[in-house]
Amino acid sequence: MEFLDLPGRSRASGTVRLPGSKSISNRVLLLAALAEGVTDVYDVLDSDDTRYMLAALQALGVGVEDRGDNHWRVTGVAGAFPARQAELFLGNAGTAFRPLTAVLALSGGDYVLDGVARMHERPIGDLVDALRQLGGRIDYRGTLGFPPLHVHPPQAGADVAHIRGNVSSQFLTGLLMALPLRRLRTRVEVVGELISKPYIEITLAMLRRFGVEVARDGWQAFSVAADACYRSPREIYVEGDASSASYFLAAGAIGGGPVRVEGVGRDSVQGDVGFADALAAMGARIAMGPNWIEACAPAQGRLKAIDLDCNAIPDAAMTLAVAALFADGTTTLRNIASWRVKETDRIAAMATELRKVGATVEEGDDFLRVTPPETLRAGAVIDTYDDHRMAMCLSLVSLGGVAVRINDPGCVAKTFPGYFNAFAEIAR
């Protein structure tokens, strides 16, 4: 297995230009494909997950042209994919798999969607059930409720669908993106609490950019009009990735700073910019502009522990678990059940790896409680579980002045291929 040895460091400062947001990149690429007209998409994230989406769109007959420098020109199909049959391999890209499942289920072709072994363990039954209510015809090719899937042309369905909100916000995102293809007024009602609401806000904002306004009743019901259709905005710029910003902001809070990230800020549509507020609650000094955020360590003393509901920042909250190693007291992260159905079971994985460096960790179904050791244990070998965020989060341990080995560092290619180079630039 490949590994990367990170030397112990104690300072962090500098400026990082963030890569494009994964969540926004894949939404925009799919919407541009469905729209009427040509869309120039700038600052697209170059990563495994976006490559899977681009390859899928090409297989479906969409014109996608690489114009260089993360600029893609997408020629929209105005709702109907030219390829009526295709087999799509989508790796472990939930931001591609879930929306494409919904769109293809309502678009009138015969398609197979598959992914890596971990994707076969990530639930999709709630989305499939909702699509079936709308007339979708979807078969499981393996375990009931999980990929791979075989999608057939839809039949007539209801004008209301119900979907559970507490498993993955990507299910609702996929449904909302697919609804304009029906050309019927359709209402989606959320059963129970909707998790990760900021990701739905991203979806609604992107649909609006492509000409579709979703009417909503709080967070419990969403409606799309019969005449809704996607129209190209001609050009669109992708924000920097706010989840990726969390590692560098935490580095500034741990290693003195200032560390500035460029590409997200006060004007961001991404909920993970709320990570900066969590760091501030821990005592970090935070400054923010429209398109940048800067973090420094507390003026005096160490960070302090927090007890936080992380529903709104599920991905960035992972970084808080590692920041807790550098805080006085016991940090509790709550409402993180969605971690268990991500690229790996992130609650179990994080608990295991934090214990390797000496932390006392308690894990529950939907919480993680971290008490730092008096001294971090040097020489830990960190396993990453083919999970990009595990690798990036746990690199921060090295800012405690201890060397760490990161196994399979290449897994960061899922969202941030240049992460370790960027980290080396700011770690002193």
From Swiss-Prot:
Its EC number is 2.5.1.19. Disulfide bonds: none annotated. Phosphoenolpyruvate binds at residues 22, 94, 122, 170, 346, 389, 414. Pathway: Metabolic intermediate biosynthesis; chorismate biosynthesis; chorismate from D-erythrose 4-phosphate and phosphoenolpyruvate: step 6/7. Transmembrane segments: none annotated. The keyword Cytoplasm applies. PROSITE patterns: EPSP_SYNTHASE_1, EPSP_SYNTHASE_2. One of its GO terms (molecular function) is 3-phosphoshikimate 1-carboxyvinyltransferase activity. 3-phosphoshikimate binds at residues 22-23, 27, 168-170, 196, 315, 342. GO terms for cellular component: cytoplasm. The active site is at residue 315. Keywords: Amino-acid biosynthesis, Aromatic amino acid biosynthesis, Cytoplasm, Transferase. Catalyzes the transfer of the enolpyruvyl moiety of phosphoenolpyruvate (PEP) to the 5-hydroxyl of shikimate-3-phosphate (S3P) to produce enolpyruvyl shikimate-3-phosphate and inorganic phosphate. Belongs to the EPSP synthase family. This is 3-phosphoshikimate 1-carboxyvinyltransferase. It comes from Thiobacillus denitrificans (strain ATCC 25259 / T1).
